[in-house]
């Protein structure tokens, strides 16, 4: 931050140095996520990535269909994006979650039609910790040639296995894995076209105008590497915390809403009953 503080979009020496480091970070991240560097778009947060994936894809591909599938238990940024698309004429299908807190692959299969252009689901619930089988769902979505799949992996990244290669669009955020706030990304398959939501420059392949926050995005490569390398240790720590939380809640007249199975500890939703 102190040495390479230049604007990576500038032509002067400091700018070129920052740009080189930024692209090195992009390439390293792409290698870890099993994709090409041009499939990594840096953003400021998961909410922005979700909006870019959902609204950006829908607006750019409306000629492919008008139907979008999601669930009734998404992050608020996804819900807001869906509400906006609905207000301008898109058909949004909100699948109800099961008692285990997830959407099943068959739910998506039954809801898909020839007019469906996008399915967007959260991988791990930020409220209950329920884990939706996004790998199975991606396989179902890809049986429809005009439909793509977006997964919000903000809560799952670095904590559970993610089928990176199966996801057409994927959201993650640095601060959920002990990285810097203000740093996130959208993984986008290179053949997909998005409508930019921020105008004013050619940064991020023309997908996000404005000066790039080079220091935090450069640091993101190391943040991701440490998260993936330490995933098993993180899982063990979360399991221990989850047991502690679960045992503690049993001491109170509380009703538990988190599923016992297919849940990422220590997420534990409960409410004290009168």
Each predicted region: which residue ranges?
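Pyridoxal 5′-phosphate
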Residues: 1-274
